[in-house]
Amino acid sequence: MAENDERALQKVSLQSNDGQIITVDRVVAERSLLIKNLIEDLGDEAVMNEAIPLPNVNEPVLRKVVEWCEHHRKDPPQTTEDENDSRKKSTEIDEWDQKFMQVDQEMLFEIILAANYMDIKPLLDVGCKTVANMIKGKSPEEIRKTFNITNDFTPEEEEQIRRENEWAEDR
């Protein structure tokens, strides 16, 4: 059996910060560069016999991340050189990912934090693009309302900021 076929059949256990263990296919877990590098560093045996602790991710968020990784398991593997311009400029999100990101704000931000921690750049991009689309075209007041942010600037401070950033406004 080829090495890739063996990897496809292997299972990996992930342990959330609340002690829950989720067992997934290794290829799914390796969508996370953190996990992929950990497996490479520790070797197959160590990881196959023990759950990988993820101290910054709780079970509901880990289940969502695993769901995303499962759906994207056949995507080309990410590389550290995946910093191309199209990724940075576009806020378009494919339909499945849009539906996946239709969660409450707390879950959305937890997914973004988990994607960052677990080094899953494509999921991090989808999360950040979702937030970008939520604020696109909105005034500061509308953004504050959307994210339940209290304005702690005095009117004088707001006016000074407005003057300093006048050049950036759409006209």
UniProtKB/Swiss-Prot annotation:
Residues 112-171 are annotated as: Interaction with the F-box domain of F-box proteins. Coiled coil: none annotated. One of its GO terms (cellular component) is single-stranded DNA-dependent ATP-dependent DNA helicase complex. It comes from the Eukaryota. GO terms for biological process: exit from mitosis; G1/S transition of mitotic cell cycle; G2/M transition of mitotic cell cycle; kinetochore assembly; mitotic cell cycle; mitotic nuclear membrane biogenesis; negative regulation of cytoplasmic translation; negative regulation of mitotic metaphase/anaphase transition. Disulfide bonds: none annotated. Component of the SCF (SKP1-CUL1-F-box protein) E3 ubiquitin ligase complexes. Interacts with scon-2. Essential component of the SCF (SKP1-CUL1-F-box protein) E3 ubiquitin ligase complexes, which mediate the ubiquitination and subsequent proteasomal degradation of target proteins. Controls sulfur metabolite repression, probably by mediating the inactivation or degradation of the metR transcription factor. This is E3 ubiquitin ligase complex SCF subunit scon-3. The gene is scon-3.
